[in-house]
Design a protein with these regions (language model features):
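C-terminal accessory helical subdomains adjacent to catalytic cores in phosphodiester-
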Residues: 4-134
Length: 134
């Protein structure tokens, strides 16, 4: 699991994805994990993601303790995303986050230039019971 904004250059990100893809399941948030957290809130794509698309994608540092995305999450939730104190507030919103994620980019290569996440896809895969396929 990693954040796309860990790579400054698009080419470095794509090179990493090409190397890692193999049999692994790559879980990516673009620009960062705070996007996934924001998706736990009602109408998050329309209220928070779309209006802030460019600023979110760039995700620049806006203070000594926040990037744009972490500050946005803090404003929405009243919690610092690095503290973990938000977990109980968000755990009931996982299904909402999964559904909202589906309107964003889920292709990990396209996330080099688009806002997206495939965390929900991983959760859905983890929820599947392999015995159902027998």
């Amino acid at each position: 699991f990693f954040d796309r904004d860990s790579y400054e250059k698009t080419e470095d990100y794509i090179e990493f994805v090409d190397k890692a893809i193999g049999d692994n399941i790559l879980t990516v948030t673009s620009p960062c994990f705070e996007l996934w957290l924001i998706l736990h809130y009602e109408a998050a794509v329309g209220k928070y993601v779309v209006p802030n698309k460019d600023m979110l994608f760039q995700n620049e540092k806006v203070s000594s303790s926040h990037t744009f995305a972490s500050r946005l999450f803090s404003e929405i939730s009243g919690s610092n995303p690095k503290s973990g104190s938000f977990f109980n507030k968000l755990k009931g919103g996982i299904d909402l986050a999964i559904e909202q994620e589906k309107v964003l980019e889920q292709d990990i290569l396209k996330m080099a230039t688009e806002i997206g996440s495939n965390v929900g896809a991983l959760i859905e895969q983890m929820r599947e019971d392999p015995r159902d396929e027998l």
